[in-house]
Structure formats: structure tokens, C-alpha cells
Amino acid sequence: MMQNDLSVFNEYESEVRSYVRGFPTVFHQAKGYKLWDLDGKEYVDFFSGAGALNYGHNDENMKQKLLTYIQEDGVTHSLDMATKAKGEFIDAFQNIILKPRNMDYKIMFPGPTGANSVESALKLARKVTGRTNVVSFTNGFHGMTIGALSVTGNKFKRNGAGMPLSNTSTLPYDQFLKESNNSIEYIENFLDNGGSGLDKPAAFIVETVQGEGGLNAASSEWLRSIEKICRERDIKLILDDVQAGVGRTGTFFSFEPAGIKPDFVCLSKSIGGNGSPLAITLVAPEYDKFAPGEHNGTFRGNNFAFVTGTEALNYWKDDRLEKNVQEKSERITSFLDDMIKKHPEMKGVRKGRGFMQGIMSPIEDLADNIAGRCFEHGLIMETAGAEDEVFKLFPPITIDDEGLERGLSILQQAIEEVTAESNLVAK
Amino acid sequence: MMQNDLSVFNEYESEVRSYVRGFPTVFHQAKGYKLWDLDGKEYVDFFSGAGALNYGHNDENMKQKLLTYIQEDGVTHSLDMATKAKGEFIDAFQNIILKPRNMDYKIMFPGPTGANSVESALKLARKVTGRTNVVSFTNGFHGMTIGALSVTGNKFKRNGAGMPLSNTSTLPYDQFLKESNNSIEYIENFLDNGGSGLDKPAAFIVETVQGEGGLNAASSEWLRSIEKICRERDIKLILDDVQAGVGRTGTFFSFEPAGIKPDFVCLSKSIGGNGSPLAITLVAPEYDKFAPGEHNGTFRGNNFAFVTGTEALNYWKDDRLEKNVQEKSERITSFLDDMIKKHPEMKGVRKGRGFMQGIMSPIEDLADNIAGRCFEHGLIMETAGAEDEVFKLFPPITIDDEGLERGLSILQQAIEEVTAESNLVAK
Amino acid sequence: MMQNDLSVFNEYESEVRSYVRGFPTVFHQAKGYKLWDLDGKEYVDFFSGAGALNYGHNDENMKQKLLTYIQEDGVTHSLDMATKAKGEFIDAFQNIILKPRNMDYKIMFPGPTGANSVESALKLARKVTGRTNVVSFTNGFHGMTIGALSVTGNKFKRNGAGMPLSNTSTLPYDQFLKESNNSIEYIENFLDNGGSGLDKPAAFIVETVQGEGGLNAASSEWLRSIEKICRERDIKLILDDVQAGVGRTGTFFSFEPAGIKPDFVCLSKSIGGNGSPLAITLVAPEYDKFAPGEHNGTFRGNNFAFVTGTEALNYWKDDRLEKNVQEKSERITSFLDDMIKKHPEMKGVRKGRGFMQGIMSPIEDLADNIAGRCFEHGLIMETAGAEDEVFKLFPPITIDDEGLERGLSILQQAIEEVTAESNLVAK
Amino acid sequence: MMQNDLSVFNEYESEVRSYVRGFPTVFHQAKGYKLWDLDGKEYVDFFSGAGALNYGHNDENMKQKLLTYIQEDGVTHSLDMATKAKGEFIDAFQNIILKPRNMDYKIMFPGPTGANSVESALKLARKVTGRTNVVSFTNGFHGMTIGALSVTGNKFKRNGAGMPLSNTSTLPYDQFLKESNNSIEYIENFLDNGGSGLDKPAAFIVETVQGEGGLNAASSEWLRSIEKICRERDIKLILDDVQAGVGRTGTFFSFEPAGIKPDFVCLSKSIGGNGSPLAITLVAPEYDKFAPGEHNGTFRGNNFAFVTGTEALNYWKDDRLEKNVQEKSERITSFLDDMIKKHPEMKGVRKGRGFMQGIMSPIEDLADNIAGRCFEHGLIMETAGAEDEVFKLFPPITIDDEGLERGLSILQQAIEEVTAESNLVAK
């Protein structure tokens, strides 16, 4: 396949295919924040594989480690047997990530996807409590398998199940309720009122920033209140850090600024370093209660991802990457504020934090149109929210100033063009 | 990590870890049917990553293709955007696999695991029929996420869900009923009797050989009857070929000898060629009814697996591999029959077909003890069945005579030792 | 309303009305085995309110007791407060029924219907075991509320729920499996096989004779095997004696001949004596674990039914009624055998036992046509089975020879007419 | 049983018994608003069988009609066959209740309890919409069978199910949310936000005044908003008028002042006139879609209740009863306001409307203690709310001034005594 031709996809791939519709070209090569299609056209990547490519494409150090590993016939696939590559990953994760943060968790390899991690945490929280209900939050997004989909708020996605999704209750996320600044009182009321119909949950599952749900960022105070609510009622706290974790918000775990200690932490996406499938579930030792093999899966031992994932952890040995993200986050924030001010016709609201920010607009199709215009001009960027009402800046966290400015510049141009041309109609 | 030391796993990994307990060593390198641990000890692999390594470890052609791809900074991770590597995989699958078999299916990339494929098929079958119940079979095994676990028969695994698993009904697999040769009459009776309590199912989900469930092989006649039952009642047929597919039974799809046409086919494990996470769901075009993005997932676009998976398909351009499997299957069969005859104290029954055969024994711990002894003597082999009552020969389908005989010889020694030493007690 | 006119029903009552369609007349008075409509036409009642009128209509002793009670302004409605009428009922039930049979049960008043009794037993069995699954049997019928409907086999009724019915599994009733004489081996296999997908049940719920399900009568041996299966596995046994109990099969409890001791017994229908709404749940003392008020209901204290129900228990102070039923059952049996022999074109099979016998015929509409013809000739009789394939003789158990013969004679005439006229076609 | 002795209840009745614990005496006779126990002690009844005795005990007209009916051997039990008594009930209900209110409903007889009516409406709403989710409200109470319990908010009761209750979502009732005057905005937000996780419901089920849930009275405006929400989204509206209906709030249907037109109305409790088990479901003709027999039940045809229920409808031929209730409601309101003012230590809040009013107090056990003291002084009154935090005045709606004042006077005395003696501690 040497031609930039989508016909093989159009003809043979299922209708469910999605991103290829928004980015209709055949990509071939990628490095850092850049992608090239088969025509050689270069794209700036403000999408980062929906958070799976936080370190950019084909990081050179990871690449070299992986090439050596493959060259030497290192074990590729190992289920949950012990391998040198896996041992080194565990060791690095323990010593670079957990210990310096005074975190004490058992590491579970639940299968290679974020949904696997979510499913394992849900199962374990139910098992250790003997309760079946799990509280999730409005606009939460946790995956497409039935267990994970049951705690996902998006109705279009839920509808794909073809059957009722049960054993879950949705409560309002931070700022979902319009009349108050937070939803804590409402949540406590539902939990404690003996007539609320909310069966005592095994766990809460929560994201610190809802990446798919529209870049809703919970405040640290809200997160601490949620933790307190759980602690006081013996409810387990599952922190789904699949999209917001691994540095995207400026710290390795997105919940570090809030200072909370979840009982379960779900990690995936960028944990493998280069976008290779890998997920882990961190489990507080007292809840590490699955019997051997009670949860399993074929691809728990993806050694390529162990190799690149281990190399990636080196980014966290000092605070340079953290600082880079935090500094550039401010640049993104000020850029977005500026756009909102310059284009009041967008009726834009800035959303999110760190390297997961964007603008929500009530204008019909605006976010989609801007993302589409960006693509034409060589910038990959996606939308988020139940109605795709947010455009979402997700650059690699390793991006340099040049890359960031190049992307922002294209985005600015797209905003200007779309707002100028469109007959803007609020939804 | 240069020492063969399990302490990092024992200390930091979750108790749910399983295979590392049966094979307590740190593996490092692997090639074809061989594995080496950090002490340099060589093992023959009759396990094949539970079916994910049908082509053996680090096949040289795949390895070279992959090295080149990585060297050239080919796209690693792409969600469901179009990439050259993905396009070539689709093209090869279409032209090498589907077209020559006169099969007309849309290819869905549901996420990288077999469970993802199963979940996508279950969701779609329910969606297109508007029915919620799905019939699965005794000892069926389809995965650990809630949707897939709901159709899995193993009670120990089901118990891990921590909640009731619903919208499924289990019916007896071929030869599960003792008094009759097949279960077809029973199934028809339950479906058609207006008082059986079996709500009309959206689909049947079935394996041709139950790999995890104890190497139960359905007859072609039974499979055709199941297809007929479905057709006559407008019930969709989901064929889970995750473990038995990709050549393990001697044909690419395990259901080819039966001549049936499932509505959905689940493939994973060896579809990526070298054990890299990849899964596809084949969907009859008339049921390709997910809206764009209605089912999604981060790791649908694992390009390393596309590269190696495409290369692997070359094995199917002629019939050499098929013939190799079919011939060596006969050797395995006669070896197992021989063992059963020589060691009547095992009360062994040969199970399975092709390169997924083994011996079921009612003797307490016998299968486990034999597998343990094999490991000591340098052969990796696992057990199967709800009570681990079967030891299971799963050599790579590319194995040569020397490898096969070496493995069988170790197995023979293990059987002889265990049966000689043990105080055999039937369960 | 003095005219025999159905227009008020046709115009204002819901389409769900059913018996009025088969017996299209307006009834007014009734005594013993006789009913009269507004035209004064007399009918013999071989229907007995589907088992709620085992003692016939308006038994004179009950009537007098009730008239006095009402005349004296006895408490009519009392929830679960103590009343004289309730105390006397409990006392009589204890002394006339339980003690002489060496039965030790707590009496629960779960609401006035059989479904209330079933729901209370299901809830309690789940609560005391901490398990959610309940095993029911093919063609079992337990009621229309969601809990009771979940354990009912009839698909037409289940479909009325408008949602999936969960937490139940159906296993084959005695003689449902065609190839064997009983289903015990199959049931044990499903329970004990670790891969059967049958989650360990809280309870089995079973009828001794399936009145709605087609007059399937379980053998005493089968019932004892079911009890043994439950005992050996710590599964609770719920005996639904709503239709077969209170003397219909010749003993007060239908399970007396089998000699089993259920953990929960559901009674309703004729327990109130004259067809007034009343139900009780007998609970083995060790499982009497509902907290006060954890299950409740407005009509638990129907004192009219306590009064008539207490009077009805006097029938059980000696064995005259039992003997009457047992003797007349033989007459019914021989009559039905004779009909089957004389009319082989019915392809009839005799079903049931005691005063719940009938003939199953595979001939399209035969049972319905015979019941319809009986109605024309002055006999009320209904059909049963998922396809209404059985006509069902349900005379009052207090019927005398004259009444029985009169009914049988009408039935014989109907059979002769229908078999003579019809173009009989097997389904 | 001639002695006022509870031993038969204590010894033989299940522990689940409840009211007998609060009112520990054996009642025997009753008339109007009076009850007598076996010692001849007289009690004023401010309980009215939890709403089943709205017309008081043994109303003389109903009694005479019933005596005549029984004397003449009228049909007692008739399933859903046509009887004279049933026809007259339908006719009266149509002509006295529905027609004058311009209401067009089919009448369904779903079984004799409120829960039967609720279950039938839930099933039918799901069936006609093809959706499974039903929205209920905080502190709603609809019954103890699994379908009805699933829409009941009380956690203690829900826990009795022993299994997860699914296919329902709870939303905040009027004034449940503290920060705003009504919950309408919140509800609309949950329904319309594509990410709220609230699957589109088949129906809302709502009470106008939550009798068991703590006498929460929805405003007419709130009810109209709920109706509007349903209409605009094609959601069915089920009005559970089991407790608040049949005159308890001053109009026959409690929703008359709000002017709404529910799709389904559930009636029971006092619909039978004298506390005999009877329930009806009113179904908008376009949703009368059960097939004949798709929902059934043994005690749908309780003719005694038809006779007394028909007689009771005569109370609604003119507006005297309505006026009586409305006038005396004002007396109750002013009495309660006065008590709250005189006894600020109760921290009382008046709740409810019409003849279902009471006082909520946060003081630990206050409501229970007052009800207990009332009983000692000869007044029957119960508590309500998830924590029994409300005492609840439920006199017969036919009560005269003397009876009302006598009851209020006892209540006043009890309040004075309890507040004087108690060491009042807020919960």
C-alpha cells in the first residue's frame, strides 16, 4: 500500500470506524509531535492518541531500547509469567513512581486496556465489599466493555450495549449542578437519606478531569470531599487515571495536587510509553484479594510495552518534564482565554487543566468545524463532550515551544476562519 | 534485572498473578518453540501463550519486518485512523483469508483483546435483534470483562465479578449431557417449549473447541445443528475463534471443516502474529450496524501487530502450514492414545483436536502434577478445565519434528514419573 | 345490572381480561359446585377458581361464621395488627395442620396473593444465603409480579415484563428431558460442574404438580431427590403449594406423600376457605430472618378470610375429606383413561394427579374446543400448558358423586362432539 | 380466643410482624373511627389501615349490602370472569368517578394489592415503549414485590430483596434538593444531558403525597412540570394514587387539583370501601396493550370488595364528603401549626396535605414516642419516613367533629407528656 487511498478502509472495515472519518488520510510515519501521511504531508499532533502518546511518537530512547530487545529475541508475549522486561518495569515503577510518592500499592496487570483496568477495579471493589452497586459520575467515561460501559455516562455509547446496564448509579460531578458550586451536599444527601433509593455502593469511580466527557476538571477540594465521603462510609474509591494520568495534567498522577489516596488507581494509555497496549491497576494492599487467576487475560504480558514503558519512566526521575508541562499549560490557558475574548461569538468557556484543556461552545457544530479546519491546515485535534461541544488540545507533554506554537497558530487560524464564515447558531 | 530472582514479583505484583506460580522462573529470550530463562535454562514451549503464539516466538520474518518498521519511525499507535500498516493488514486479510474462502465479512477492530472482540459481538447482536438474552454453553470461556464473563461458564471466574451476571443462559455443549450423544434435542426443546423460561436469545456464542473449558471439541455435525437452530429461529451465531482459530486446529478458522457461516467471528491471540495485542471481529455485512464510534477503544490501532500480523498471513498463502498441523496432529493423537493405554491408572480420556489436544484425568491433581514435572524437565505446558483436570498440549503450529518429539519425550517422562510416584486417588 | 349483558366489560375493562372471553356470561350466584348466570342458567364448576375454591362456592358453615362476624362489626382490615380472627386462624393452623404433621414453621402473612408468598420466600431465601440466583423449573408458574414472574417459565407471560428477568436459572422439571426418566442427573451435573455457568443458587422453587404449566406431576422420588440435592449443597427449598396445596391432590400439603421438608412453603388460593384473598408463607424457624417490617403490605390482615379460613380448617380435623378426594381421584383417572382409549384420535395423554388431572392433546385447539363446548353444555373447565394443550379437571374437592358424574358426563359429551366434528390436525 | 393475649402471635407468627409491636393488643371490633380490643378498651383510629379504611370501619351501608350479597350466595371469587357485582362496580366507577371528571381510561384489575397495580403499570409502560428504565423519586414507596420494590426509595425495604434491584433510576422529589425550591431543573438536566448516564425511561412513577416516605407533598406546579417533562419526551407518567387517592387529600384523585392527566393511575387500599383487598389500574386507552391474559392473578375478582367498593362510590355522587375533608383538613393544619409553635423543642415541621398530615421532628425517637404514648391513651397513629421521623395523622375521611377533636386531644396530651419528660436529642 503505497498510495494515500482510503478505499480499503471504506470497503472492508466496519462502519463503526470513527477517527478515520475526521482525519481522512493514510498516515505512515511519526516522530515526536509530528505525523506524516502517505503523501508526505506533515501534521502537528494535538491529539496524542487520545492520551496514549503523551511522550510523543517514537521517542528515540524508547525506540532504541525496543530495537535492541527485539534484535536479541527478548520474550514478546508472556501472559503473567515472569520476564526480565516485566521485572524491570515493576522495579522501575516501584522505585521511580510509587516510593518517592510514599504510595503503597500492589500492581495488577489486568489486560492491556484502560477498560481492563476499570473492569478489574470494579470487580475487586465489589468482591471485597460484598456490595454490587457502584457510583459513577455524570459525563464519566471508563470504557466500552459492559462493566466499564455501565459506569460511563455517555448515552450514545450506553445505547450500544443493546441491553440494560445495571448495578450502577450516576451522581453529579463537580459543577454539574448549576445552582451550587459543588455537588457534595447533594451526594451526601443521596447516600445518607434512608429513602433515596441509592443502594450503598461498593465504590465510587471518578476521573479528576473528564477527558472524553468534555474536559470537566474537578477541583482539589471536590476530590478531597469525595475521598472523605468514601472514607466515612467505608466506600472504596477508584480513581480512573487512564486519560488524565501519566503526566497529562502536569504530575504523574493527576490526583497528586489533591493529595488523596484512592483505593484503586487505573492506568493505561501512556503507561506503555510509545502507545503500545498496556494497563495496570494499583490496588491498596488490603484489597488485593483476587485469588490467583480469578481475573486473567491473554495480553497482560506485552513485553514490548514493558520495555518502552520502563524507559518512559526515566522522564520522572527528575522534575524537568513536570515543569515543562506546568509551564506550557499556562501558555495554553492564556492562549485559550485570549481566543475566547477575541471571539465572543463562540460563547466559549475554557475547560480542563494542564495538557488537557479546550474550549466548550454552545454553537452548533462549532467544535467539529474548528477541528475539521485544523486538520486541513495540518493540525490533528479532536472534540469531546456528549455533544462534541468541546475542542480539545492534547499535545504531547514532551512538546517543545516550537511545536506548541505551531499548533496554536494553526488553531488560531482555524478559529478565525470558522467564526468568520459560519452562520453561528446556538444549540 | 540480571538475576533469576522472583522477589520483585512476589513483593510488588498482585496476588492475582497466576502462571508465574506454575512456571516459577524469569524468562528472557525466546525463539520458535524455545524459551530461555535468566539462568540460561532452555524450555520447550507446549503452551504457546495460551494460543497467542501459534507461530512460535519471534518468527524471523515478522521480526525483520517489525525492526524495519520501527527503524523507519512507522506510526506505532493510531486508534482507528488509517495507517499504511493497517491498510496492508486489512488488504492481506481480505485477499489471503476471506476471499479464497468465499467469506464476506466487514472487519471491526474492537480493541486489542479477545474479550474486546466478544464484547463487541455481544453488543452488536443484541443491538441488531433488540433482544437481550444470549445463549452460551457449558464450559465456554470468553473473557474476563463483565460482558464476556457473563457468557463464561467457569464458576470460579464468574465469582470474581462480585455481582450477578445477567442476560445470559447456559445450554449444554456437545457431549455435556451424559445420556445422549449430543445436546441438540435438549437445546431445541428449551428454545421451542413455551414454558421453558428461556427468553428468545439475540445470539448463541460458541467455540468449536473449548480451550480453557477442558479441550471439549464439538463435532462438525453438532456445529451444523447449532447453525441450523439459529438460522431457523433468527438467532445470530457468534463463533468465538479466539483460541481455536488462526490455525490451531489445522485450518485458519476452526469452523472450516464444519462448513458453517457464523454471523460474527471473534479473532485475537495469534492474529497479531508474534503475540502482540490485536483482535478483530468479523461481522456479516447485514449486521454491521454500529454507528461511527458507538463502540471504540484506545488500542484498536496497534500498528506493530498490524505489521507482524500481515507478515503472518503469508503462512496461509499455500497449504504447507495446514498440512504440517494436520500431520503432526495425528502424531500427537497417537502419542496421547499410547500414553492412555500404557498408563490406565490415569483413567485418561483424550480430548480436543488438532494442536489443542490433551488428556483428562479424574485423578486428583494428576494434570497439575504432570505439568509441574514437565516444567522441571524443561517443558512448558498448562492445564485446562474447571477443575484443572486436563493437561493440554499447545505447541506452536510451526513446530518441526525435532521440537515436537523433544516435547513429547519430556511429557512421557513426566507421565511415567508422576504415575509411578503418586498415590493416585480419583476425585 | 340485572341483564346478562357483557357490554360494560367489553367497553370499559382492559383488553387483558381473559376468562370472561372463554366463559362469556355474567355470573351472579354460586353454591358448592354450582354457578348461575344472570339468565339463571346453571353451570357445574370444574374450574374452582383455578384452585381458590377447593371447598366449593359459599360453603354454608363458612358463610354463617362470616355473616355473624360482619353482623357484629368484627374488624375487617387490620394490616398485621393482632385481631381475634387472626389469632384464631393462627391457632387453628398450628393445631389442626402443623402439629399433627410434626411440622415446625413460623407463619408469615406476606400479602394476600400467591405471588406475595412467592416473593416473600424468594427475598428471604436470598437474604439468608447472601446469594442472588434462584433455580426454577421448566413450566413452573409462580405469579405475575416481577420477582415471581422471573421464576415463571411461560414465555408469553415473561414477555409481559417488558424487561429482562434476571437472577434466575431454569432447570428441567421431572420428565421434561425426553431421553431419561428423570432430570436429576442433569441437575446435579449443572450444579456441580465448575464450568456450567450456573451460579450457586440461594434456593430451588418447585411445585409438586404444575397446575398452570400443563398438569405435570413430579414423582415422589424426584421430589425427594430435589430435596436431597438442596440439602447436600446448602440450597434452600421453596415449595410453591399455592395451587396444588390445601387438599387439591388429596392431602393438605401436596408434598406429604413425598415426605419432604421444604424450608419455605407458599400457600394461598384456597387457604382463605371461600376464595377470599389470603396467603401465608411457612418459614423454617432458622430462616425467619426478616427484620420487623422489612417486608410488609396493606392487605396482610384480611379478617374475612381469617374467619372463613379458620372454619375451612375444620375439614382437616379428620380424614373424611382426604378420603373423598383420594377416592374420587380414582374415578377421574379411570374416566380420563377411558376417554383416551375411546378417542385415540385425541392422541391424549393423562396428566396430573388427585383433583388436578386432565388430558394433554397435541391436536391443534382441541383442548380449547372441548372446554368451549363444555361451557355451552353448562360445565366450566379451563385449559393449561404453555400452548393450552391440556384440558384440566379442577372440581371442588368437596364435590359429591352426583356433581362429579354430572360434570364428567358433560365433558364426555363435549369430547365426543368435538372429536366427531373436528378436522383434527396435530400441531 | 377470648383473652387479650398476644402469645399465639409471639410464638407462631414470623418475626417480620410489625404493627402488632407498636399496637400490642388484640383488636376485635370496629365501627367508624373506633376500634375495640378484647378487653373492651376503645381506641380512636387516626391510622385508617394506612389508607385502606378511608371510609372508617364497617360503614353501615356497605355492611348491609355485603350481608345481603353473602346471604344470597352471590359469587365470592371469580378471577376475571364477569359477575353482576363486578359489572356494577365498573359501571359505578365509570359513571360516578371517570365521566364527571372527563377521564377516559380502561380499567384493569391487576390483582388485589397496590403493588399489583404498580407492577402492572410498570410492565405495561415498559412494554409499550420498548424501554426498560423507569424513573422513581426519592422517598417514593410503591410496594414490596420486586418490581414495585425496585421503584421504592426506602433502603431498609430495598435491602430485604436480597439482590440488586435494577432497571430503575431515582431522581429528587419536590423539595428534596435543599438549595432550590424545586428539582425540575435538575431532572431536566439529567434527562437531556447526553452524558448523564440516565437511560431514557419508559416512565416516571410518582406520588402526589408520599405517604410512607414522610408525608412529602408535591406542589401542583411541580406535578405539572413533571407531566410536561414526560409529555415533551414521550415518557409515560404513572401516578401511584394508592395511598393518597380515594379522597384522602380531599378529592377522589389526589392529582385533581394539579390538573394533570397521567397515562396510568394506580388505585387500591380504600377502593374496596371497607378495607377488602382490591386494586385497579387505570390505563389510557392507547396504552391498553396487554394481550388477553398476559398479566393475570387469582384474586382479581374479589366480589365482596366489588359490592362494598360500589357502595362506597356513592359518597362521591355529591360534594359533601369532599367538603368535609377539606374543612377538617384546615382544622388539622391549624392544630399541627399550633403544636409546633407551642413546642418549639420538637423542632417540628408540618408535612403533607389534606387528611395525610403530620409533623416531622429531627429529635431522636420523638415521633415513635408520641405515637406510643397515643396508643396508651387510646389513639392509633403511625409514623412515617425513612427514619420514622414523622408522626402521621390519618383519620377516616368520614370522621365527624367529635371524633376528630377526641383524637387531636389525645395527641395533644401525648405531645405535652413526651416533650416534658424526654431528654430531647436531635439526630
Swiss-Prot record, chains A, B, C, D:
Record GO terms (molecular function): diaminobutyrate-2-oxoglutarate transaminase activity; diaminobutyrate-pyruvate transaminase activity; pyridoxal phosphate binding
Species this protein is from: Marinococcus halophilus
UniProt cross-references to Pfam families, sorted A to Z: Aminotran_3
Keyword Transferase belongs to the record: yes
Required cofactor(s): pyridoxal 5'-phosphate
Pathway info: Amine and polyamine biosynthesis; ectoine biosynthesis; L-ectoine from L-aspartate 4-semialdehyde: step 1/3
Modified residues (N6-(pyridoxal phosphate)lysine): K269
Protein name, as recorded: Diaminobutyrate--2-oxoglutarate transaminase
EC number: 2.6.1.76
